[in-house]
């Protein structure tokens, strides 16, 4: 598909990111395979019908789109996948200035909506950690305590971890830094990363127990470099490893998806950390409105303090939860009633 000149032009004209290209490629491959035609043939056919001034309702394009949508609806694909694939096909046609005929509305099957009780608990995550190696322990603890999505997690580099922990070491080569961090139990790294879906930069943090497991994991990778991925997984490999955990534990499905997967760790974080929606959105990289993005900048130290006050809620091993020291305040309130002053302590 990437060798098709029309597809290459489409991606180049729209400056489509590689991750988004894969989504279009999947949808368009599915569409061309269903019709057993090439992209070039399908576009040429639609252009020829326009040049011949065939009424929209009588064009092959309308029949092709309706038949393809019916095929998707009868498949085992989720409603979201059906909508996404069909939308991408129409976008491709429109890019080449082909008018889309009016299509009748269709009712999509209601997708099962997960609720709080469908999410993994700390017990589930502990059970998963007991059956995997240090590589998966590191990534599971990172994702569940930071709420970072899979794409951003796999985009992190060793350098970002070393830089993010600079308050806890005095620098040096990777081995020296890891040896220093290995003996600390309070490391909460600060990560500044980009949300791949939206290009938004944001700050997030992970727990001390995640940091310790990351250090252990990095020490098992001799010759690791600053430019190397922090977590050495491809997206497909990570997906397969989560499937192995879920199926091995017999946890089954919730709706169309397996119970234990990377995205449910993100939901675990959002649903359990106990902060307001505003702070959860900050930590997970969800966008504010454009005015806020332009004028209001996040203070990472303040956000880190807020995160640390709540991170116990997403830490998995109780013995690793640090003590939270509360400050006591003495407040005097002056009240005036009927001309008299009362002090309440």
What are these regions (language model features)?
Residues 14-97, 206, 274:
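Non-catalytic DNA-binding core/recognition domains of DNA-processing enzymes
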Residues 222-228, 240-289:
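Short, basic (Lys/Arg/His-rich) helix/loop patches that form interaction surfaces
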Residues 122-151:
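Basic, Lys/Arg- and aromatic-enriched nucleic-acid-binding interface segment
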Residues 156-213:
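Conserved tyrosine-mediated DNA breakage-rejoining catalytic core shared by Y-recombinases
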Residues 195-216, 225-246, 262:
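C-terminal catalytic core of Y-nucleophile DNA break-rejoin enzymes
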Residues 110-127, 187, 198-209, 224-228:
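DNA breakage-rejoining catalytic core of tyrosine-based enzymes
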